[in-house]
Amino acid sequence: MSALEAIKYSRGKLEVLDQLRLPHEHHYDEVSTSEEAFDCIKAMRVRGAPAIAIVAALAASVELHNGSCTATGTEDVIKYIDSRLDYLYESRPTAVDLGNAVRLLKKTVRGVKTEGLTDAEAKEAIIKAFIEASEEILAKDLKTNKSIGAFGAKWLQEQYKITDDSKITVMTHCNTGSLATSGHGTALGIIRTLRDEGLLRHAYCTETRPYNQGSRLTAFELVHEGIPATLVTDSMAAALFRLRKAEENIAAVIVGADRVVRNGDTANKIGTYQLAVLAKHHGIKFMVAAPTTSIDVDTETGDDIEIEQRKREELTQISGAVVNADGSIDTSKSVRVAIADQRIGVWNPGFDVTPHEYIDAIVTEKGTVVKGEDGKFHFEDLMPERFQ
């Protein structure tokens, strides 16, 4: 596991790395209430679908562990927990992992056997089950990411028969590594595995405007891991593919997902769709890396995905550490500056939807799924229990 940790947890205490301060400053916020977790997620101090779900679940656990629930009867205790989970869900409704975690935890507390217990004993049993289920979400995520990395690298090896003389170059978008998960990562986890298996030549990461998760976070992770990498702006991808595909053996664009729906349409950070179109035009594989918890089999197509609109200031203003006259960086100072006329109108969707037609493979912890003869992705064999 990478030394980078977005989440530090022990029972009764949760700390979350403030990713808005990266790459210049490591600061952990203590998160002890649902309100603090909501603010942390909404402000994007933590981001990435798996990490969001983990933070929400663990924050509610810490809150319960520390005695926030004053209800006594079983029904009232469950009602209180439901209210906390419903509140946390609204922090990022696009992230299907969060919705899955909410449903799992609601089901967990309703499955606790309370017959013959006093109100106090029943309350203790319900809270204990909730906390243990939340902790299992954290533990399971790391195993999931390692498996995604292995399956993704295997699929690419099968496609390209990679040797020491034909190592591949890949591109990734946004941030899908240790900072977006409990560790290793999804799309960036595949890149890590490619590096570990001697299959990777180079990685490109996009800046990922307007919030710059690529330049602030992914570039930071790649440097930290010693992975050979280059940062490009989002608008450079087409030129890169045209001019350097053959020379650098650019083989794949690998992205994460906030939500994959039944037919394979994928919601991910804004800018993903354009990369998929460019990859298809240039004959480059386009891969989505996502845990099965991010697959929403109840939503038929991407047209039904709710897309969050972000605040206008993300496009018109930017924050960063101060660069001194000699070129050194003063990490003790952060300033916010305007980069556009503040009167300009702004359209700022946080995500876009990539149609399944542009996706070559969806990599999960259970295996890699490719399109069937009908041109759509089918997840029935991968997780039959979700189709009963």
Swiss-Prot record:
Keywords: Amino-acid biosynthesis, Cytoplasm, Isomerase, Methionine biosynthesis, Nucleus. InterPro entries: IF-2B-related, IF-M1Pi, IF_2B-like_C, Initiation_fac_2B_a/b/d, M1Pi_N, NagB/RpiA_transferase-like. The keyword Heme does not apply. The keyword Cytoplasm applies. The active site is at D258. SUPFAM superfamilies: NagB/RpiA/CoA transferase-like. It catalyses: 5-(methylsulfanyl)-alpha-D-ribose 1-phosphate = 5-(methylsulfanyl)-D-ribulose 1-phosphate. It comes from the Eukaryota. GO terms for cellular component: cytoplasm; nucleus. Its EC number is 5.3.1.23. GO terms for biological process: L-methionine salvage from methylthioadenosine. Pathway: Amino-acid biosynthesis; L-methionine biosynthesis via salvage pathway; L-methionine from S-methyl-5-thio-alpha-D-ribose 1-phosphate: step 1/6. Gene3D superfamilies: translation initiation factor eif-2b, domain 1, Translation initiation factor eif-2b, domain 2. The record marks C174 as: Transition state stabilizer. It is found in: Cytoplasm; Nucleus. It holds the Pfam family IF-2B. GO terms for molecular function: S-methyl-5-thioribose-1-phosphate isomerase activity. PANTHER family: METHYLTHIORIBOSE-1-PHOSPHATE ISOMERASE (PTHR43475:SF1). Catalyzes the interconversion of methylthioribose-1-phosphate (MTR-1-P) into methylthioribulose-1-phosphate (MTRu-1-P). HAMAP family: Salvage_MtnA (MF_01678). Belongs to the eIF-2B alpha/beta/delta subunits family. MtnA subfamily. NCBIfam families: eIF-2B_rel, PRK05720.1, salvage_mtnA. This is Methylthioribose-1-phosphate isomerase. It comes from Neurospora crassa (strain ATCC 24698 / 74-OR23-1A / CBS 708.71 / DSM 1257 / FGSC 987). The gene is mri-1.
